[in-house]
């Protein structure tokens, strides 16, 4: 697979035009089904609790703002909440990948739309809002309108719904933070690298991030430090999908799309720690190693695929994968050792075939 010749270009384009496009078409169809169901659920939720307003919208291109695709069978719908203004955003690095929303000095609790979810210390609790939202969704899904094809998964406190017994969608409450950049990511972009250029870096920072209410590695497992666990449960997890997507265009996005296809076919199993998000993270790191545009042209995409997969093998062997913007956050944290070891074997088998078989993409 390694090398720069017309055979590589042909294989890359054939794989992309056939398997990647087939995957995209299937995902697009699934997204429309998921979005329709989520909008119906949120309509009923809003009727019971007007503060949870449906923010899922379809664009002129047929895409849905607020839907994140984790795999062809796993999705996330982001519900953006209103009125964060009376809170200060505090990102001091105390809780990895998270920040807290603290009532501004001089502000009264009664000035907030979310008054009953504010802790005694003045923090807006992500856990309390999530608990309230989950209870309402549970009530909605028990009605005849939804009970035949929707089921609330209650294996944790996230609001996860099984649809048609085929798809899982997590509905996540979040605050949108445009135009600000988290302190935990202040090191980015790294000095001295030509990628991204100044204009792209500034656009990426202006995109901002989301503060989401979700379970994290600490709250999902028994933590001996109860106070730390409670603090993290009340904190909001930072998600930076918009900023990441701004950096991945052209050949970079094409590389990621091919990797997603390869993951679905060769690295997916129940409980796999290798998510599409980890692949996206490693592509971003690969961008820093290969800054020039020509390095992401079709003739070089074979090398980029191998490079990312070798990074993945290394991460799995070290049992650590640092978040691209928030390096203190380990994306493999708390993942079972046996699943990491199995993923390492599957990934190495895949990358070995890509390296030694000049026609690998034709058979994968």
Swiss-Prot record:
Keywords on record: Developmental protein, Differentiation
Keyword Hydrolase: no
UniProt xrefs under SMART domains: Mab-21
GO biological process terms on file: cell fate commitment; embryo development ending in birth or egg hatching; nematode male tail mating organ morphogenesis
Family: Belongs to the mab-21 family.
PANTHER family: CELL FATE DETERMINING PROTEIN MAB21-RELATED, PROTEIN MAB-21-RELATED
Function description: Acts in a cell autonomous fashion to specify the properties of the sensory ray and non-autonomously in the choice of hypodermal versus neuroblast cell fate.
Name of the protein this chain belongs to: Protein male abnormal 21
Lineage of origin: Eukaryota, Metazoa, Ecdysozoa, Nematoda, Chromadorea
